[in-house]
Amino acid sequence: MKIFTSTQIHELDKYTIDHEPVSSINLMERAAKAITHCIEAEWSNRTPIVVFAGPGNNGGDALAVARLLADDGYQVSAFLFNIHNKLSNDCALNKKRLIESKRIKQFTEVSVNFEPPTLTPDTVVVDGLFGSGLNKPLTGGFAAMVKYLNSSPAKVVSIDIPSGLICEDNTYNISANILKADLTLTLQQKKLSMLMADNQKYLGRLKVLDIRLSPEYIQNTDCRYRILEENDIRGIMRPRDDFAHKGSMGHALLIAGSYGMAGASILATKACLRAGAGKVTVHSPKRNYDIMQISVPEAIQQMDPEETLFSHPVDTEPYNALGIGPGLGSNETTAIALIAQIRRSTCPLVIDADAINILSSHRAWMQQLPKDIILTPHPKELDRLAGTTSSCCYERLMKASELAERLQAYILLKGHYSALCLPNGHIDFNSTGNSGMATAGSGDVLTGIITALLARGYDAPSACRIGMYLHGLAGDLAAKDLGKESLIAGDIINYLPKAFLRMED
């Protein structure tokens, strides 16, 4: 699914109107019918409905919904806020249609003073104040209206996007002036701001309504953002060769685990094997030898000369991919070995966890990273890499994207919607995964999966896309059977086979 900017959304509407062809008012009616259908599926016609409509096309949608609900026997009160005595053409036409229908319980056009209605826990508020065209924080009376609605006990359904939430960048927005919906019915596509963790409290449940906007425009229009879905991943996964052998399935090298952190190397290694690498070698301190041999007998153990830490780089000539960082520690000896390892590596690289933290502490080394390297930071690790703390998720995402462009690297910013920032400035969001995966070791598992895919011959962007999708899918399948509360990283590994099977169906 592509994610268009607010400007592209406007252009998509216009293209649909011009090329379907369909009039703008009929397109608005189409959207209103889809919204009305969802509301009627949730609440019976005994539910009191209060509609708040703004002066633009979002308000026009809301007025059309008010009319359709009233036609279906709902008791509807509608308030149209026309402070500047200027309505969009379609909003004005839907106002006329609503009044002429004569089925609405109450219609009030507000131009100066507003006496808000009493809202009870049984009331459903339809929010059509502002939509995806909003480009600045709400102020004045509209901000006061949002605060009033947020303090009310009523259920709130937002049309397209909660009023006050900006489609993309909310860095300088005012949280108190953004409506908190219980249900958001967004039209055609999710908006970028809906993928940011700090905006989830405004959305409630989120549903995407297909209102049949031009598929031709959607397909042919390049956009910076997209959400990866199952068909996208199926399209880049290769069928397994029936004549494959362990030599043809790739040899992965993992440099992971300091003393006391052998668990990270175990998790990464098991995940690497489960993701289909033909052979996996693990380079770890001497003290980890016994536990590694016992825990992952399928892997080849390679011991560092040091007892407790990574101290010497490894010749990567025999390997098809290298993953480095899980449980590595940040000892200065390890730091020096890390940069030496990066300099001499001849195979594709995945940098994670402590290896990222070491680079953050030695920022000059980042300029020595090879092109197409993969880094998989969580939000705080990304802030350390960027050198500044981000005030919001959007700001952090932009920093990750800028860093990916500057380094010509692939930066996979982990989160609920993990974001793969590409060297060309584009960003792919993952659509799988759940909150149960917020557990120690989950990132180590992801590193193992991506390293395996690189070793198997996938290029960096494909390995990242497939890797994060399968990682999340395995977590979803595990959560379905085990629940989210007790999910651990090992469960993700155990459900990787089912994730692969799902993609083979």
Enumerate the predicted regions with their spans.
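Internal gly/pro-rich beta-alpha loop/helix module
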Residues: D122-V124, L129-C223
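Short acidic-hydrophobic sequence patches enriched in Asp/Glu that either
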Residues: L87-D90, G141, A176-L179, I488-D491
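Small-residue (G/A/S/T)-rich helix-start motifs and N-terminal tracts that mark the onset
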Residues: M1-N82, S88, L183, M194-L349, ...
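Nucleotide and nucleotide-moiety/phosphate-recognizing core
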Residues: T36-L129, P137-I159, A337, S345
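Short gly/ser/thr-rich secondary-structure transition/capping motifs
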Residues: K105-N113, T139, G164-N170, I233-R238, ...
